[in-house]
């Protein structure tokens, strides 16, 4: 297990949304690159970046910022938001993103998943499955899809994806704790460990994952590290300890 501090970019700034609601925005840093440097100095080796503008419009709008983070830090960058074509995928791969997250496109364009695996390989791809009540949400969490999260995870595993970020929308940005059982179910469907996202409030939430660490690849945290209820150092150490148990 490893920690992925989150940087969500909206209008060029590092923000967090509450439950994915674009009207409930908290700005934490006017410079996402500076925020990435801070996370690196605190011990992070990975970060999870979401282009919120791109998630809403369908076209990444903050690639230049992502490129600067890749170039100016040693962080491995997982990037999502608006990646809905092979051309966009290839562009992000070319600038050095470690992994690209496909979300809405997996539902709206199922053929893209297999084409993406052929283009960049399954290990550089993450299926971003955002769900509310077990149903996958799309278009920046604005729309329901009618697709069950576990069913989509199963399909992506068969398509060749090696990573999944599973986000519980109802918990995201709310610091209400993790739904451990849901992550285990997703890992079973996907047949690979999953990256847990949504609800981390403190180090104790990460510690709760220790008994199921075999099902958890990593943990994304956002608001908790910005507001100080969890430090990056604590999160990195807790992930490492959980893996050893």
For every predicted segment, state its role:
Residues 8, 39, 47, 79, ...:
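Conserved, mostly hydrophobic/aromatic
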Residues 112-119, 207-221, 225-245:
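C-terminal helical cap(s) of enzyme catalytic domains, especially alpha/beta-barrels
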Residues 19-23, 93, 97-172:
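Conserved anion-binding
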Residues 2-6, 46, 74-78, 98-101, ...:
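Structural preference for beta-strand elements that scaffold enzyme active sites
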Residues 53, 61-120:
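Glycine/small-residue-rich loop that forms an oxyanion/phosphate-binding "nest" at active or ligand-binding sites
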Residues 60-67, 110, 142-151, 176-185:
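Charged helix-capping and loop-helix junction motifs
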Residues 73-100, 181-215, 235:
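Catalytic cores of alpha/beta
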């Amino acid at each position: 297990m490893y920690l992925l501090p989150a940087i969500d970019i909206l209008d060029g700034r590092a923000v967090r949304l509450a439950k994915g609601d674009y009207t409930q925005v908290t700005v934490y840093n006017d410079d996402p690159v500076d925020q990435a440097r801070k996370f690196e100095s605190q011990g992070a080796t990975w970060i999870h970046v979401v282009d919120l503008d791109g998630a809403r419009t369908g076209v990444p709008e903050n690639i230049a910022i992502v490129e600067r983070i890749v170039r100016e830090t040693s962080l491995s960058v997982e990037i999502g938001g608006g990646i809905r074509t092979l051309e966009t995928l290839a562009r992000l791969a070319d600038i050095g993103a470690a992994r690209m997250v496909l979300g809405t496109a997996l539902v709206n364009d199922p053929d893209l998943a297999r084409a993406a695996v052929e283009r960049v390989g399954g290990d550089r791809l993450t299926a971003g499955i955002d769900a509310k009540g077990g149903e996958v949400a799309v278009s920046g969490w604005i729309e329901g899809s009618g697709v069950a999260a576990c069913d989509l995870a199963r399909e992506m595993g068969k398509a060749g994806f090696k990573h999944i970020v599973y986000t519980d929308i109802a918990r995201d940005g709310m610091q209400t704790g993790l739904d451990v059982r849901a992550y285990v179910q997703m890992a079973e469907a996907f047949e690979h460990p999953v990256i847990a996202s949504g609800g981390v409030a403190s180090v104790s939430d990460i510690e709760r994952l220790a008994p199921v660490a075999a099902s958890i690849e990593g943990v994304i945290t956002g608001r908790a590290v910005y507001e100080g209820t969890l430090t990056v150092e604590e999160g990195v150490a807790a992930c490492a300890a959980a893996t050893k148990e």
